[in-house]
Amino acid sequence: MANGDPVRSVGAALLRRHDLLRVDPSAWNAMLSRQPALADLPLVAGWAGRGYPVIVRRRLCGDDADAVPAAVPLPPSHGKRRIAIALPSGVVAVLPPLLLRDAARAAPRAWQGAVAALLELGQAVETTPRVFGALLWEQATGLPYLTGASDLDLIWPVPDRRILDRLLGALPRLEADGPVRLDGEVLLPDGRAVQWREIAEARGPSAHVLVKSVDGVAMCPVAHLFARAAPAA
């Protein structure tokens, strides 16, 4: 998977939603030897050996505290299953989600105008969109994840309220004018994320939205979204 972003070790920074993990193939095979049922699932046995990433998932109560919670999403042709796994921290390297500009070539032809407009929007409001969902996995693996019903799932890092307001002022119009539903989240400086549509529809000074992190979900007043400091790198 081509990605110009720097690789981080797990200990170098907190894991964030939608981070990708590159797994050492020998460690992958060792994991499968301990969980042989996984090796029988389509595509899973050779996943790491082909260079495919896995994705960070929310930690569950049964996960080992020292393990990295991850998931393997299979394409629709293989049941669209999301397989939960846990990996030792020493066998993975962390990559941020793929930039939209790097995933654009995997997008359907009908989406290309919308993708170009979204990239222009990112430049105009001073943020850089990244992808998750079907477009990410189509680009990362070359497997057929996109269907006629797929959304375009985007992550928009928003360092401050000014950029958030400018972004939310433009996204609904771009979606209305384009061929694809724009789903996704704004990424707050502290690593938490909120669906952009939910913030756009929030009304009044006391409005709350659902905020997600790798540790769980919680309701948060819109007015307090930027109250927490960004984590140290």
Language model features: what each stretch is:
Residues A2-A134, R173-V180:
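Helical scaffold of the NTase/Pol beta-like nucleotidyltransferase catalytic core
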Residues A67-P69, A149, D153, R181-D183:
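Broad gene-expression machinery/nucleic-acid interaction feature
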Residues P73-P75, P157-P159, L187:
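Solvent-exposed residues in well-ordered beta-strands and their adjoining turns
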Residues H78-K80, R162, R192:
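Residue-level signal for secondary-structure boundary sites
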Residues R82-A84, P88-V92, I199, P205-A223, ...:
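Mature, function-bearing regions of proteins
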Residues L119-L152, W156-R162:
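Active-site nucleotide-donor binding segment shared across nucleotidyl transfer reactions
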Residues R161-G169:
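Short, conserved charged micro-motifs
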Residues L174-V211:
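Conserved catalytic core of two-metal-ion nucleotidyltransferases
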